[in-house]
UniProtKB/Swiss-Prot annotation:
Expressed by the venom gland. GO terms for cellular component: extracellular region. Disulfide bonds join 36-51, 43-56, 50-67, 58-65. This is U16-lycotoxin-Ls1a. It is found in: Secreted. It comes from Lycosa singoriensis (Wolf spider).
Length: 82
């Protein structure tokens, strides 16, 4: 086989491998994102809790819930460099 054909086959194989690997990672990410809400995303105590032990804060009538860190946690994360 000529070097050009070998290079083309190597390139196609590499692209196929990377595409399969990317699809696996994407499905893992999507599944974990469904399970909890990140900071400043909507949340619900029963169906969609907040990630990383962040509090789910709601308005006084129990609607418009959002994941928010408290002031102590915000300062702690800032100090740690997160």
């Amino acid at each position: 086989m000529s070097p050009k054909v070998q290079a083309l086959l190597l390139l196609v194989g590499l692209i196929t491998f990377l595409a399969v690997h990317a699809e696996e990672e994407l499905s893992e990410t999507v599944e974990s994102e469904r399970s909890c809400a990140k900071e400043y995303q909507w949340c619900d105590w029963n169906t969609r809790p907040c990630c990383d032990n962040i509090s789910c804060i709601c308005s006084w009538i129990g609607t418009n819930c959002e994941c928010k860190k408290g002031i102590i946690r915000t300062i702690k994360d800032w100090y740690k460099g997160k």
